[in-house]
């Protein structure tokens, strides 16, 4: 088993130093200067190409499948009794393939980032500029921070790694404390803030992306295991970084929410950081999620798909009556129409009585996708951070330890998100308002669970009560929509025309779901525990080099 672990790390480290394959963005830009040999970089362009896999190959194992049940299923965005229901119902075991896929996927990001940093320090020569070296390290540290921020909110204590060779030499490593994981993330992000530029080639990270993520990290840390209050110092830092992005970046929300999820709007003005997938790309460079998300070939132009996911009862109940733009962009519901799907037929209207996934399903190859749709190959990027996320982070940081927020720029930016959805502004907001707004804004973007864990670490009793009142594992035979657009949940009577509405007509799970504090964080994959028994031991302090 130890030999296998060494081999895997070496493959990951080597892959990080290969050039990414083709696309029409920075990912396929051939370097004007090339290597002295296979591992030495002699130009800025060659070094820039070496960081390109950090935007796709590094994230592939996580994005390939695990991202959906962990990021959205765990949050109860959607449910299927046939597609990884254990994440919704909190029945995940250490043997789960998506669990191990996420663990290995995040460490692919970490070890690939480490490899880039090592290459900059030991494998550059010739005309490579100091600016190019610093930028490459900053991009690598940003991605490493993102990976660890995800891991912290899935497992809590994790293993911090800066030197791949030390891990290869001794793969039995202890877990590190959550407070040290936070500090490691912050150190990486501070470096990225200081050394990335405010503007970059499309798809490349900027200092604004680093600041936005840093704001989220400080907000998360402010209440993490802090006895039900938020640390004012961390709140102030969260406000400062979020405010800087909101007020000074010059970026703005996309006008139309639905446009965020169309292929030709990849790397739009609202996209601060995203996984950059190659349309029609090879394995490890492509977004495989299309077939897992799309419910029928009628919305993929005949491309094979197999999703049985539907929006959960609880998720669909979060949408206000007027919030049809975001609901329709996220889920198909009866009567919802899409002009950009089945274009040659005049558009597509969903006529069913379920709630299949819409977000992540851009249509078929003959729609407005330039032919770049095929089985397990979507042309869409995967968002890591959108500007709307920073807006809501700013609002929550401004709310801080108060029960309500009734004025100021935090409320203004909260309402900017609602204005885009064409729903009424709020004159004051609470944490409950922020929780609901986040859920509908980022539904099926594989991020809601991570925010829920942050709130759980801040207010555990509140969030346990929330989780246990989400109708987890429940489903309905039919969802209908009345003339006002309101959804009704239930089933049709035996006559086929009388609709029976209400919880008594829901289909309940076969077992009682009672979520407790020890259920929130996922187990470490059993295969890794066998390789590294220290995963069963208490975490230890990390020795920082900076």
From Swiss-Prot:
InterPro entries: SusD-like_N (IPR033985), SusD_RagB_dom (IPR012944), TPR-like_helical_dom_sf (IPR011990)
Signal peptide bounds: 1-21
Disulphide linkage map: none
Family annotation (Pfam families): SusD-like_3, SusD_RagB
Subcellular location per the Swiss-Prot or TrEMBL entry: Cell outer membrane
Gene Ontology MF annotations: polysaccharide binding
SUPFAM superfamilies: TPR-like
Any one GO cellular component localisation term in the record: cell outer membrane
Functional pathway: Glucan metabolism; xyloglucan degradation
Lipidation (S-diacylglycerol cysteine): 22
Stored Gene3D superfamilies: 1.25.40.390
Major localization class: membrane
Entry membrane topology: Lipid-anchor
Keywords: Carbohydrate metabolism, Cell outer membrane, Lipoprotein, Membrane, Palmitate, Signal
N-palmitoyl cysteine lipid sites: 22
GO terms (BP aspect): symbiotic process benefiting host; xyloglucan catabolic process
The protein's role, per its UniProt record: Polysaccharide-binding protein present at the surface of the cell. Probably mediates xyloglucan-binding before xyloglucan transport in the periplasm for degradation.
Other facts: Gut bacteria supply the human body with energy from dietary polysaccharides through glycosidases that are absent in the human genome. Xyloglucans are a ubiquitous family of highly branched plant cell wall polysaccharides present in the vegetables we consume. Enzymes involved in xyloglucan degradation mediate the conversion of otherwise indigestible plant polysaccharides to short-chain fatty acids.
Membership in a protein family: Belongs to the SusD family.
Entry protein name: SusD-like protein BACOVA_02651
Organism per entry: Bacteroides ovatus (strain ATCC 8483 / DSM 1896 / JCM 5824 / BCRC 10623 / CCUG 4943 / NCTC 11153)
């Amino acid at each position: 088993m130890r030999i296998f672990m060494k081999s895997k790390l070496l493959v990951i480290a080597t892959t990080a130093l290969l050039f990414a394959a083709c696309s029409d963005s920075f990912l396929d830009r051939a370097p004007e200067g090339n290597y002295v040999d296979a591992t030495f970089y002699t130009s800025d362009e060659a070094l820039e190409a070496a960081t390109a896999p950090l935007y796709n190959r590094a994230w592939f194992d996580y994005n390939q499948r695990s991202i959906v049940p962990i990021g959205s299923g765990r949050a109860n965005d959607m449910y299927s009794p046939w597609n990884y229901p254990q994440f919704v119902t909190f029945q995940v075991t250490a043997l789960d393939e998506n669990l191990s896929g996420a663990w290995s996927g995040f460490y692919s990001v970490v070890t690939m980032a480490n490899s880039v940093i090592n290459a900059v320090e030991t494998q550059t020569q010739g005309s490579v500029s100091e600016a190019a070296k610093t930028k490459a390290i900053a991009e690598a540290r940003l991605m490493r921070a993102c990976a660890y921020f995800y891991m912290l909110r899935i497992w809590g204590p994790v293993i911090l790694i800066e030197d791949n060779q030390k891990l290869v030499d001794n793969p039995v490593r202890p877990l590190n404390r959550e407070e040290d994981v936070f500090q490691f993330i912050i150190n990486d992000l501070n470096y990225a803030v200081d050394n990335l530029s405010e503007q970059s080639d499309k798809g490349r990270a900027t200092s604004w992306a680093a600041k936005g993520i840093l704001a989220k990290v400080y907000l998360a840390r402010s209440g993490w295991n802090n006895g039900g209050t938020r640390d004012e110092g961390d709140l102030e830092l969260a406000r400062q970084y979020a405010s800087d992005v909101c007020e000074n970046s010059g970026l703005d929300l996309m006008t139309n929410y639905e446009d965020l999820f169309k292929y030709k709007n990849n790397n739009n003005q609202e996209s601060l950081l995203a996984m950059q997938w190659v349309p029609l790309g090879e394995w490890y460079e492509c977004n495989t999620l299309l077939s897992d998300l799309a419910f029928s070939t009628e919305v993929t132009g005949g491309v094979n798909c197999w999703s049985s996911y539907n929006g959960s009862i609880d998720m669909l109940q979060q949408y206000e009556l007027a919030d049809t733009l975001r609901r329709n962009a996220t889920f198909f519901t009866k009567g919802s129409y899409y002009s950009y799907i089945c274009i040659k037929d005049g558009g597509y209207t969903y006529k069913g009585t379920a709630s299949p996934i819409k977000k992540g399903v851009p249509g078929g190859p003959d729609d407005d996708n330039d032919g770049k749709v095929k089985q397990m190959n979507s042309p869409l990027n995967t968002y890591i951070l959108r500007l709307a996320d920073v807006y809501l982070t700013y609002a929550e940081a401004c709310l801080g330890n108060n029960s309500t927020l009734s004025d100021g720029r935090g409320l203004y930016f909260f309402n900017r998100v609602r204005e885009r959805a064409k729903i009424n502004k709020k004159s004051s907001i609470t944490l409950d308002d922020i929780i609901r707004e986040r859920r509908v804004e980022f539904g099926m973007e594989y991020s809601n669970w991570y925010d829920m864990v942050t709130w759980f670490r801040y207010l555990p009793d509140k969030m346990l009560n929330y989780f246990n009142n989400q109708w987890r594992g429940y489903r309905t035979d039919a969802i209908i929509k009345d003339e006002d657009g309101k959804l009704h949940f239930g089933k049709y009577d035996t006559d086929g025309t009388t609709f029976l509405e209400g919880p008594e007509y829901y289909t309940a799970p076969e077992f009682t779901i009672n979520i407790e504090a020890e259920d929130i964080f996922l187990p470490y994959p059993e295969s890794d525990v066998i390789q590294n028994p220290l995963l069963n031991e208490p975490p230890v302090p990390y020795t920082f080099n900076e």
